[in-house]
A protein has these predicted regions:
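A bilobed periplasmic-binding-protein/Venus flytrap-type ligand-binding module shared by bacterial periplasmic
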Residues: 134-139, 179, 252-264, 283-284
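Mature extracytoplasmic/periplasmic domains
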Residues: 259-315
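Ligand-binding pocket segment of bilobal, Venus flytrap-like solute-binding proteins
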Residues: 170-247
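Extracellular/periplasmic bilobal clamshell ligand-binding domains
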Residues: 301-336
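Early extracytoplasmic/lumenal segment of secretory-pathway proteins
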Residues: 25-94
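Short beta-strand->loop
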Residues: 32-35, 102-108, 119-126, 135-137, 143-144, 152, 221-222, ...
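A structural signal for short loop-to-beta-strand junctions that line the ligand-binding cleft
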Residues: 79-84, 102-134, 152, 161-165
Length: 336
């Protein structure tokens, strides 16, 4: 009997082989961001310079923090975004709790201190933010008012109708402020403060950037805004000053994350690597002058360590149930 092995080998060699299919090329990158449009132009130019091939595939959708993250949650079953870029860390913490994010440790993220990163790498922080008073010098002089120096000052009747703030249900800045005052005063006293402050407000805006822009243009003498936005407006010639409240500064930081179920995960990871790089951080600093989570990039603004920052528990502030409760009560009391 002839051995069967040579025959089997011959038959195997005659069977046509089909190579394993190569992974499908990712031809898109969709980014959801809460950065303002004017600063995005600067950041995007740096991105195109550093990663032109990826930038050619990329697009971003810009919105205020609240609606942007609500959209991510609404799309959970069929994600349309690959990356979240420049969103307040409390919202990112909430998104991680809801299962909306995928862990990814971006290259160079080791240069970011641990307190500015999620312990399971759900997000990494990049830009630090502080809330201050945007005071239009010309307008406040015309009204013969002195600029407020503290949160307590804003309750003075002389400022009635001269203050603009934003809505915490749509603005990350406003929610940050709400949670910060809760931490500073305790919830009961915080609501008493907001009830008194509401009497002096002329307008409550949807966008957190609007109060600063309105102060810069002279539509209001006082806007409660992110300090870096006021500094940018001042550099561009607006008659505006930044005043940090003496009785405590609300602060947070923005971060980036990979969306769970992203359709273009490899492109997303390349972008996230870039977004914490020294080149990207330098572009953030060039526009904002604000402090960064990386300490190896110089900034023109004040150092966080030199400021009277409100002690805030970001995990608590980012808890969806806590946030929903505060925002719901604010809407019940102050919705216009």
């Amino acid at each position: 009997m002839r051995p069967l092995l040579p025959l089997v080998l011959a038959l195997v060699l005659l069977v046509p082989t089909t190579p394993w299919p190569a992974p499908a090329a990712e031809d898109k990158l969709v980014i959801y961001t809460a950065y303002e449009e004017n600063e995005l132009k600067t950041f995007w130019e740096q991105f195109k310079k550093d990663l032109p091939d990826l930038a050619g595939k990329a697009s971003y959708i810009r919105g205020s923090t609240g609606p942007t993250m609500a959209r991510v949650e609404a799309e959970k079953a069929n994600p349309q975004a690959d990356v979240i870029w420049g969103v307040f860390n409390d919202y990112l913490t909430g998104a991680a709790t809801k299962g909306l994010l995928e862990p990814y440790a971006a290259q160079e993220s080791q240069a970011i201190p641990a307190r500015f990163k999620h312990p399971e790498n759900m997000w990494q922080g990049v830009t630090l933010l502080t809330v201050a008073f945007a005071v239009n010098q010309k307008k406040i002089t015309e009204l013969r008012l002195t600029p407020p120096q503290s949160w307590a000052d804003l309750l003075d009747p002389k400022y009635k109708g001269h203050i603009v703030m934003s809505n915490p249900s749509t603005s990350g800045t406003a929610y940050l402020l709400l949670a910060s005052h809760a931490a500073r005063l305790g919830e009961d006293k915080m609501w008493q403060y907001y009830e008194a402050l509401d009497k002096n407000l002329s307008q409550v805006t949807k966008s957190g950037g609007a109060p600063g822009r309105m102060a810069a243009s002279g539509e209001t003498p006082i806007g409660v805004a992110l300090a870096y936005e006021v500094e940018v407006a001042k550099r561009q010639g607006a008659p505006i000053d930044v005043i940090y409240p003496a009785d405590g500064i609300a602060w947070t930081f923005e971060g980036n994350a990979l969306v769970k179920g992203a359709k273009n995960p490899q492109n997303a990871k390349r972008f996230l690597d870039w977004a914490v790089s020294k080149a990207a951080m330098t572009s953030y600093a060039a526009w904002r002058g604000a402090a960064l989570t990386r300490t190896d990039v110089s900034v023109s603004g004040p150092k966080i360590s030199e400021m009277n920052l409100i002690a805030i528990d970001f995990v608590k502030a980012g808890d969806p149930a806590y946030k929903d409760r505060l925002v719901k009560r604010w809407l019940e009391k102050f919705s216009r």
